C-alpha cells in the first residue's frame, strides 16, 4: 500500500518521464555517428517503376539527401537505391574551448534523431518524387501515379556511433554500402532485367557481367558510376568574382566514385566542404541527371 501511495504522490509528469528515460540513449559529444535510412517496404512501392533504373526515383533520392544535409548539418551524404547514409562529425572540435558546452544535434538524443530525421526524409522524398513524376502517364500507370501521389512512402532509420578509435569504421560502413552492396545490386538488377531470375539463379557476379556483355551491346565498364557505386553529396564553396568584389556562395557537389580505404578518404568524409584536390587520386564522375 505504501508503494502505491508513493506512486500516487509522485507527479504524473515525472512518472511518465521515468518510463520514457528507459530508451533515452545519447550519443556522446566526442563521438562520431551516421544515420542510415532505408525505404520501408520499397520493393512493393517500386515494383512498377522503370527498369533497370528509374531516373526520377534516383533524382528524388539525391534531392532528398541534399535537403537533409542542409537541414541537419551532416558532413557527407550518400545514397543508393532506396537508402541514404548521413555522416556526422564529432560535436567537440579539435580547437575546443573549455568554457563552451558542445553537443550533437538534439543533444545527441537517439530517439529524437531517429524519429525526426526519418520523418523529414519521408516528407521530402514524397514531395520530390511527386513533382518529378507529375502527369507522366506515358511512363507510369494511373495506379502507380496514384500510389506516388498518395505520399505514403516512409523510411526507417538506424544510428551507428563510433568513438575516436573506431572512427575508421565510418569509411568501412560506406564502402560496405557502396562498393559491396550497391555494386552487387547493380549487377543483379541488369541481369535480372535482361534475362529474368531463372537464367541467373546460380551465377556469380562475374558470370552475370559476362552474360550481359556477350548477349547485349552493354559494356559493363561504361555503366554510370552512380548505378554501380551510388552517389556522394557534400557542400562546396563557390567563389564568384565581379567588378567590385568576390562573392562566396555554397552549393552541393553531387558525384560518384569507387571508394577505397585510406586516411585521405576518411578525413574527406568529415571535411565541412568538398575540395577536389583532397581526393585527386580518385576518378570522379559527376551525377549526370538534371536536378531541378
Curated annotation (Swiss-Prot):
Q: Which InterPro entries match?
A: tRNAHis_GuaTrfase_cat, tRNAHis_GuaTrfase_Thg1, tRNAHis_GuaTrfase_Thg1_sf
GO BP, one annotated term? tRNA modification
Pfam families membership = Thg1
| Sample GO molecular function, one term | tRNA guanylyltransferase activity
- Residue ranges of the TM segments: none
Name this protein carries in UniProt: Uncharacterized protein R259
Native species: Acanthamoeba polyphaga mimivirus (APMV)
Amino acid at each position: 500500500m505504501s508503494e502505491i501511495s508513493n506512486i500516487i504522490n509522485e507527479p504524473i509528469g515525472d512518472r511518465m518521464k521515468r518510463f520514457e528515460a528507459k530508451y533515452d540513449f545519447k550519443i556522446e559529444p566526442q563521438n562520431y555517428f551516421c544515420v542510415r535510412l532505408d525505404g520501408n517496404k520499397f520493393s512493393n512501392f517500386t515494383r512498377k517503376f522503370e527498369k533497370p533504373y528509374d531516373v526520377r526515383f534516383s533524382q528524388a533520392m539525391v534531392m532528398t539527401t541534399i535537403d537533409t544535409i542542409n537541414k541537419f548539418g551532416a558532413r557527407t551524404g550518400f545514397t543508393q537505391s532506396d537508402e541514404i547514409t548521413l555522416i556526422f562529425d564529432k560535436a567537440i572540435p579539435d580547437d575546443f574551448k573549455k568554457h563552451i558546452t558542445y553537443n550533437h544535434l538534439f543533444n545527441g538524443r537517439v530517439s529524437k534523431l531517429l524519429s525526426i530525421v526519418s520523418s523529414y526524409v519521408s516528407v521530402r522524398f514524397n514531395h520530390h518524387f511527386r513533382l518529378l513524376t507529375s502527369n507522366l502517364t506515358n511512363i507510369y500507370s494511373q495506379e502507380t501515379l496514384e500510389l506516388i501521389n498518395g505520399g505514403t512512402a516512409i523510411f526507417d532509420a538506424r544510428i551507428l556511433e563510433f568513438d575516436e578509435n573506431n572512427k575508421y569504421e565510418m569509411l568501412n560502413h560506406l564502402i560496405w554500402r557502396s562498393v559491396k552492396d550497391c555494386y552487387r545490386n547493380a549487377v543483379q538488377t541488369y541481369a535480372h532485367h535482361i534475362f529474368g531470375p531463372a537464367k541467373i539463379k546460380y551465377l556469380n557476379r562475374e558470370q552475370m557481367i559476362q552474360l550481359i556483355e556477350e548477349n547485349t551491346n552493354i559494356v559493363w565498364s561504361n555503366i554510370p558510376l552512380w548505378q554501380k557505386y551510388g552517389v556522394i553529396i557534400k557542400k562546396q564553396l563557390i567563389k564568384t568574382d565581379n567588378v567590385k568584389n568576390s562573392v562566396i556562395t555554397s552549393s552541393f557537389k553531387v558525384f560518384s566514385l569507387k571508394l577505397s580505404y585510406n586516411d585521405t578518404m576518411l578525413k574527406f568524409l568529415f571535411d565541412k566542404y568538398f575540395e577536389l584536390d583532397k581526393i585527386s587520386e580518385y576518378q570522379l564522375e559527376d551525377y549526370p541527371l538534371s536536378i531541378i
